[in-house]
Amino acid sequence: MAPDILQAFMTEKTQNAPQSGKVGFISLGCPKALVDSERILTQLRLDGYDVVPTYDDADIVVVNTCGFIDAAKQESLDAIGEAISENGKVIVTGCMGVEADRIRETHPGVLAVSGPHAYEEVVGAVHQYVPPRKEHDPFLDLVPPQGVKLTPRHYAYLKISEGCNHRCTFCIIPSMRGDLVSRPIGDVMDEAKRLVDAGVKEILVISQDTSAYGVDIKYRTGFWQGRPVKTKMQALCEALGEMGVWVRLHYVYPYPHVDDIIPLMAEGKILPYLDIPFQHASPRVLKAMKRPAHDSKTLERIRKWREICPELTIRSTFIVGFPGETEEDFQYLLDWLDEAQLDRVGAFTYSAVEGAPANELEGAVPEEVKEKRLARFMAKQAEISAARLQAKIGRTIDVLIDEVDEEGAIGRSKADAPEIDGMVYLNDETELVPGQIVQAVVEHADEHDLWARLI
């Protein structure tokens, strides 16, 4: 499916206002890339450009690409091709931008190519090909203090660092985004406050490796509102927990100090939710991935986390069919799933990515075997997820409303992140509004979603 151009932010113009340059924008990939798109769009709006929703209305189109796996690269190339065909003036940025030669070879008409988080380069290229109007009046083109956001008004992503110090053999992110660079704690907290002041009810903390926040600067003590705060995940969570909104942690690598976050969840300071990518369970496969290989310790930690915080929701992702994965390894993973009883799980088959060290490993798993293992894996997890959601029937939960139509309201519980987890359906509740937090009793569940009745 071809991506839609995102209509990010529109302002009313006075009848006599000078004509603005008009930019179309396509944002592909993960929430980290979405935050990059928001930053670029914010600067373009500050410079007087309008963001428009169609190719025909745009003077130029920016495509923020994804390069995580080959399928994502192909989607990016297809999006670039569509933008060139429909508009003709295209600037490319994002993770696939590190493969500039391939992009230009496939699409010679591209005007400029830059890599991830190259904000100034992108804005500079837009200025070059569609110069900003000299009569730009910032009072006519007001940008909200929180900047341009591509998410609904009631939730937002908060990126705390860039890059990653790990060298997982299946991943090329460090080659695209570099080593870990943590944002100053004061800057992160200032942005969080702007979001809350703008009405955001849920902050989703993201990075390539959230639990490594501050490692690169030795957990330096920063300052926010006149008080010292360490550049460290626990200190960040404690500070965010004082803001009175939902705080959800994503991309948490299973370092030992993650244990220190669980009491904050039990106390209600941040949401009892961990997005923690385990990737596999077999020690042999994990070693080949260059991931932590202490599966028994991981299970024990999960048990302790749930003892401290019984409401804890654990989401994870896994790769099946990694080079060298035997049937014994895969069965080990299924047995581990049975013990771990994770709440939410995503999985995909291993796919060779250009530049990934895993490509050189022996024991490639046939595609047919990969697909069968994926189906078995997801069937197993569907049983687990269904049972865990069934256990919620009769319980009262908080629901953050995402959308309302003529059939009722759709929201999410504290156990559900946007886009990737389940929904809570409140049938016939047409008077609610997005961003509202309500209490409801769960009446029905399947393996993904809940149906509830408003109290």
Swiss-Prot record:
Keyword terms of this UniProt record: 4Fe-4S, Cytoplasm, Iron, Iron-sulfur, Metal-binding, S-adenosyl-L-methionine, Transferase
E.C. code: 2.8.4.4
Subcellular location, record wording: Cytoplasm
Domain Radical SAM core intervals: 150-387
Reaction catalysis annotation: L-aspartate(89)-[ribosomal protein uS12]-hydrogen + (sulfur carrier)-SH + AH2 + 2 S-adenosyl-L-methionine = 3-methylsulfanyl-L-aspartate(89)-[ribosomal protein uS12]-hydrogen + (sulfur carrier)-H + 5'-deoxyadenosine + L-methionine + A + S-adenosyl-L-homocysteine + 2 H(+)
Amino acids binding [4Fe-4S] cluster 1: C30, C66, C95
GO molecular function: 4 iron, 4 sulfur cluster binding; aspartic acid methylthiotransferase activity; metal ion binding; protein methylthiotransferase activity
Domain MTTase N-terminal positions: 21-131
The record's free-text note on cofactor binding: Binds 2 [4Fe-4S] clusters. One cluster is coordinated with 3 cysteines and an exchangeable S-adenosyl-L-methionine.
Cofactor: [4Fe-4S] cluster
One record GO biological process: tRNA modification
PROSITE patterns: MTTASE_N (PS51449), MTTASE_RADICAL (PS01278), RADICAL_SAM (PS51918), TRAM (PS50926)
Chief location category: cytoplasm
Top-rank EC class of the record's enzyme: transferase
Alphabetized SMART domains for the sequence: Elp3
Domain TRAM: 390-455
Domain of life: Bacteria
An annotated GO cellular component: cytosol
Residues holding [4Fe-4S] cluster 2: C164, C168, C171
InterPro entries hit by this protein: Elp3/MiaA/NifB-like_rSAM, Methylthiotransferase, Methylthiotransferase_CS, Methylthiotransferase_N, Methylthiotransferase_N_sf, NA-bd_OB-fold, Ribosomal_uS12_MeSTrfase_RimO, rSAM
Xref: NCBIfam families: 30S ribosomal protein S12 methylthiotransferase RimO (TIGR01125), MiaB/RimO family radical SAM methylthiotransferase (TIGR00089)
Functional description taken from the UniProt entry: Catalyzes the methylthiolation of an aspartic acid residue of ribosomal protein uS12.
Family, similarity comment: Belongs to the methylthiotransferase family. RimO subfamily.
Protein name per the record: Ribosomal protein uS12 methylthiotransferase RimO
Organism from which the protein derives: Marinobacter nauticus (strain ATCC 700491 / DSM 11845 / VT8) (Marinobacter aquaeolei)
